[in-house]
UniProtKB/Swiss-Prot annotation:
One annotated GO molecular function: ribosome binding
Species of the source: Rhizobium meliloti (strain 1021) (Ensifer meliloti)
Protein's cellular compartments: Cytoplasm
NCBIfam families from the UniProt entry: infA
Main subcellular localisation: cytoplasm
Signal peptide start and end residues: none
Entries under InterPro entries matching the protein: NA-bd_OB-fold, RNA-binding_domain_S1_IF1, TIF_IF1
Domain of life the protein comes from: Bacteria
Keywords, ordered alphabetically: Cytoplasm, Initiation factor, Protein biosynthesis, RNA-binding, rRNA-binding
Protein name: Translation initiation factor IF-1
Length: 72
């Protein structure tokens, strides 16, 4: 089964929300709700407000995303 077409955008975490979700402001000034990817949870990578992250989104719902990478 082929993986869906995903869109990746860099952004900055602006707010921490319950249940490992975050409000992320993308570089194109849009704000979305994003949750951490499973590998980030498994490896216990912490995401805090102000962190630069890479967000993966589907073209079907551009208001939600998945945080796949935290820049150092």
């Amino acid at each position: 089964m082929a993986k869906e077409e995903v869109l990746e955008f860099p952004g900055v975490v602006t707010e921490l929300l319950p249940n490992a979700t975050f409000r992320v402001k993308l570089e194109n000034e849009h704000e979305i709700i994003a949750h951490t990817a499973g590998r980030m949870r498994k490896n216990r990578i912490r995401v805090l407000a102000g962190d630069k992250v890479l967000v993966e989104m589907t073209p079907y719902d551009l208001t939600k995303g998945r945080i796949t990478y935290r820049f150092k």
